[in-house]
Amino acid sequence: MVEYIKYTPELSGNWSRAWSETQKQRPWQSRRLLDSATTSQLQGKLWLVNELNKLDLKFSNVCLVGGWFAQLITPLLFDNFNINFIHNWDIDPDAKQISYKFNRRYKHQNKYVAITSNIFEKSWSKFRDSNYDLIINTSCEHMYPMKKLKELNPDLKAW
């Protein structure tokens, strides 16, 4: 059972730098940054990883839908599964830049990409052409029902 994020010196360095840079470069995001690191945010991500472990399935290409800053879920997925790549889709352009700060080591290893896009636009061809074997939406309460995504992308392989 996964009960914590492996808080390594590398992760600590990434996160402290990310917090500092965000405070300087995007001070208007300070409140949201704090909201992204609450106890309930971490508990939800830990629960998700434990539920995925119970499935005993192999995932290599992950899509985070509305992944926000993805600073909690990304290391949990990489540390607990044999993940090759994570795409983080979010409609907020600030989320992309901030997520790159928190996940810079994965970005530099070409294992992480953040994309600013509305997943419910019909022209979302990058999504349809991707080879995801796991799609995670931890923001569905802020979106249209996910069946709308399937209607717009009938050829999704990971459905």
Locations of the language-model features?
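S-adenosyl-L-methionine
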Residues: M1-K58, K96-L134, T138
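Conserved class I S-adenosyl-L-methionine
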Residues: L57-A70
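Conserved acidic residues
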Residues: S60, S130-D133, D155
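Conserved SAM-binding loop of SAM-dependent methyltransferases across substrates and taxa
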Residues: F69-N82
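Short beta-strand element of Class I
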Residues: I83-W89
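Conserved SAM/SAH-binding beta-strand->alpha-helix loop
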Residues: D90-D94
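A short, conserved alpha-helix within the catalytic core of class I
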Residues: S139-D155
